[in-house]
């Protein structure tokens, strides 16, 4: 029995150490991405595909580090999105102008910085910016995303360290 005890302890430590990783992977898998419209090679953007998506992120779900092969605008319409820029550039956070003119920049998220984006604000993501996001506040987050990506590129590309 005494010889088995160290093996049992090691096995338990491995299970405990990997449980958080497995839980995070399961939570990220619960994200719903509905492509509402898709248009390839729109006028003035040959070699690109334009998308309109509705992304629903369950409460407490973390989207791991990723980037996009093109620009995106994401309008948060429900909940609060905790958004972190890891590297690769700045992301502007804007709010609509009530007169329909140019949106007002309310914040610029620098690399290494996190900002909570509430419903009513939008993020403007340049291509290639590595970032992650999380639905915070105990509520789901719904974001409408307009993307202009390189033809054939996936909607997002996960970054592995």
Each predicted region: which residue ranges?
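Short beta-strand His + acidic residue motifs that chelate non-heme Fe in jelly-roll/DSBH
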Residues: 65, 83-84, 125, 131-137
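A short hydrophobic beta-strand segment most commonly corresponding to one strand
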Residues: 138-154
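Short acidic-glycine-tyrosine-enriched beta hairpin
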Residues: 55-59, 81, 85-128
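Extracytoplasmic
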Residues: 47-52, 58, 68-71, 78, ...
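Short, solvent-exposed loop/turn and secondary-structure capping segments
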Residues: 68, 85-87, 156-159
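Soluble periplasmic/extracytoplasmic beta-strand elements of cell-envelope proteins
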Residues: 75, 82, 144-147
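A short beta-loop-beta micro-motif enriched in histidine and acidic residues
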Residues: 45-46, 61-75, 92-95, 100
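A short, N-terminal "cap"/entry segment at the start of jelly-roll beta-barrel domains
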Residues: 2-8, 14-54, 64, 98, ...
């Amino acid at each position: 029995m005494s010889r088995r005890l160290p093996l049992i302890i090691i096995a338990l430590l491995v299970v405990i150490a990997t449980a958080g990783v497995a839980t995070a992977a399961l939570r990220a898998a619960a994200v719903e991405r509905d492509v509402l419209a898709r248009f390839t090679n729109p006028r003035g953007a040959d070699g690109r595909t334009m998308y309109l998506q509705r992304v629903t992120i369950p409460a407490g779900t973390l989207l791991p580090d990723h980037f996009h092969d093109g620009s995106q605008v994401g309008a948060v319409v429900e909940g609060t999105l905790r958004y972190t820029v890891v590297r690769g550039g700045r992301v502007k956070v804007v709010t609509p102008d009530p007169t329909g003119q140019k949106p007002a920049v309310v914040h610029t998220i620098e690399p290494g910085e996190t900002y909570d984006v509430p419903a009513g604000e939008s993020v403007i993501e340049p291509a290639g910016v590595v970032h992650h996001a999380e639905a915070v506040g105990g509520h789901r987050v719904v974001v409408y995303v307009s993307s202009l990506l390189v033809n054939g590129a996936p909607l997002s590309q996960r970054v592995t360290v």
